[in-house]
Amino acid sequence: MEHYISLFVKSVFIENMALSFFLGMCTFLAVSKKVSTSFGLGIAVIVVLGIAVPVNQLVYTHILKENALVDGVDLSFLNFITFIGVIAALVQILEMFLDKFVPSLYSALGIFLPLITVNCAIFGGVSFMVQREYNFTESVVYGIGAGTGWMLAIVALAGLTEKMKYADVPAGLRGLGITFITVGLMALGFMSFSGIQL
């Protein structure tokens, strides 16, 4: 149990997708204007990562890995296309669910919901799972932890962005300029966790 808690904490803070690996920056910067929208997208990323990583782990272990189907057959060259297909299917299911049951969040997320399909944070989580050879349970914990870390970062940035609306930001830094500086300072803060050994 301690191993799984360590893996979760590591994936949320030490190896944060957004602030340590800078993955998923397109949606991270574009949707971080309001806390409510950022929180909704963060939940969507947690759901997609929490399902995509373990499902792709099963696909990789039982189909794509060398000697998984037949001795001597290695289908790992199909990793990228297979993983993207699984992620795309999961995002489509999530999009239909939100459209049906939470239309306000669906309309607030707009084009960024389908973009989760090609969000490099999602694909990065799946790729890290393969590279680190996580088993199924570790994949579930890692997927949920990585999504939680990404949500924590985007909600924190949205909160800071909302506060900066009332700040006296120099004209040349308004908009993306101050956002990049803020993200850089947040990343420096998260770097302090990198010395922790779990």
Swiss-Prot record:
The keyword Membrane applies. It holds the Pfam family Rnf-Nqr. GO terms for biological process: respiratory electron transport chain; sodium ion transport. Keywords: Cell inner membrane, Cell membrane, Ion transport, Membrane, NAD, Sodium, Sodium transport, Translocase, Transmembrane, Transmembrane helix, Transport, Ubiquinone. It is a multi-pass membrane protein. The chain crosses the membrane at residues 11-31, 35-55, 77-97, 110-130, 140-160, 176-196. GO terms for molecular function: oxidoreductase activity, acting on NAD(P)H, quinone or similar compound as acceptor. Coiled coil: none annotated. It catalyses: a ubiquinone + n Na(+)(in) + NADH + H(+) = a ubiquinol + n Na(+)(out) + NAD(+). Its EC number is 7.2.1.1. InterPro entries: NqrDE/RnfAE (IPR003667), NqrDE/RnfAE_oxidrdctase (IPR050133), NqrE (IPR010967). One of its GO terms (cellular component) is Gram-negative-bacterium-type cell wall. It is found in: Cell inner membrane. PANTHER family: INTEGRAL MEMBRANE PROTEIN OF SOXR-REDUCING COMPLEX (PTHR30335), NA(+)-TRANSLOCATING NADH-QUINONE REDUCTASE SUBUNIT E (PTHR30335:SF1). NQR complex catalyzes the reduction of ubiquinone-1 to ubiquinol by two successive reactions, coupled with the transport of Na(+) ions from the cytoplasm to the periplasm. NqrA to NqrE are probably involved in the second step, the conversion of ubisemiquinone to ubiquinol. Composed of six subunits; NqrA, NqrB, NqrC, NqrD, NqrE and NqrF. Belongs to the NqrDE/RnfAE family. This is Na(+)-translocating NADH-quinone reductase subunit E. It comes from Actinobacillus succinogenes (strain ATCC 55618 / DSM 22257 / CCUG 43843 / 130Z).
